[in-house]
């Protein structure tokens, strides 16, 4: 059992409320393996980089990243504001092109007199991911496609797009933005452990609170909060980023709050967990 002494802490026991986390089934060595960056040699988490054109098209985040790239190429750059966001005119055009599951633009914009890039969250996230992946860059007041971004449009390179975006989303980007700063970046530092735990315990419906306790490793800072916000942090930073993956689909549906939109929607075959090097008690 992993971290037996840690689990005896009265605060941890009170938070768990009788739930035994899935990750306690792992040996310490296996737990460490899941905390490795996926590109590491013999990583326990394998990210598929040879998806078909159809599979890529089935992923909203990949599909809309390609739309952003094509627009940047066709328009010879997308105008930016002084703050670095896409111009309102560009955002208005992108609103017509970008579609997202369970995302109602009319509802999302009902209180906005004008629509800026951060107001249209699917576009904002796709732009941030594309820029982090160096598919686009800022040049002379415009967002332009890089040589890498142009090359990813080819059928030969497109199959690796989702692997790049998935890796960046969980292991490079700061997802605390989606949790409105609550609990910092937790539980993103243990993304691999959380994904493995979801894959083994999310076969049946679970409430958000229980699934959070099954899949995450608590931290001391959590217990200083007046209210328990761990389920919200888990939903905002992990489950909504996974919605649409084959082995995580149940977990994502269980955790998603009514009316919320999944921002990272991955193809069904984009990520898998290789359990062969993992051992459990």
Protein language model regions, located:
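Short amphipathic alpha-helical interaction segments
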Residues: 117-133, 139, 226-246
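Accessory beta->alpha helical hairpin/"wing" motif in late/C-terminal subdomains of nucleic-acid enzymes
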Residues: 124-126, 133, 137-176, 249-281
């Amino acid at each position: 059992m992993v971290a037996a002494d840690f689990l005896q802490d009265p605060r941890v026991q009170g938070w768990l409320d009788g739930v035994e986390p899935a990750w306690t089934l792992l040996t310490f060595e296996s737990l460490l393996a899941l905390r490795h960056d996926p590109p590491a040699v013999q990583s326990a988490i394998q990210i598929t980089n040879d998806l078909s054109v159809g599979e890529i098209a089935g992923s909203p985040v990949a599909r809309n990243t390609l739309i952003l790239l094509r627009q940047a190429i066709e328009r010879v750059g997308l105008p930016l504001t002084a703050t670095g966001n896409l111009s309102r005119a560009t955002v208005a055009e992108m609103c017509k092109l970008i579609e997202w599951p369970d995302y109602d633009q009319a509802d999302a914009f009902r209180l906005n007199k004008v629509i800026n890039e951060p107001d249209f969250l699917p576009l904002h996230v796709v732009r941030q991911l594309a820029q982090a992946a160096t598919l686009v860059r800022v040049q002379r007041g415009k967002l332009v496609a890089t040589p890498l971004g142009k090359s990813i449009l080819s059928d030969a390179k497109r199959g690796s797009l989702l692997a790049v975006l998935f890796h960046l989303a969980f292991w490079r980007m700061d997802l605390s933005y989606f949790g409105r700063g609550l609990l910092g970046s937790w539980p993103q530092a243990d993304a691999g452990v959380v994904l493995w735990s979801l894959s083994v315990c999310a076969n049946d419906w679970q409430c958000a609170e229980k699934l959070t306790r099954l899949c995450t490793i608590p931290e001391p800072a959590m217990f200083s909060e007046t209210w328990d916000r761990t389920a919200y942090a888990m939903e905002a930073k992990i489950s909504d980023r996974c919605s649409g993956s084959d082995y995580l689909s149940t977990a994502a549906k269980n955790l998603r709050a009514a009316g919320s939109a999944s921002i990272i929607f991955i193809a069904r075959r984009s990520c898998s967990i290789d359990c062969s090097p993992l051992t459990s008690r």
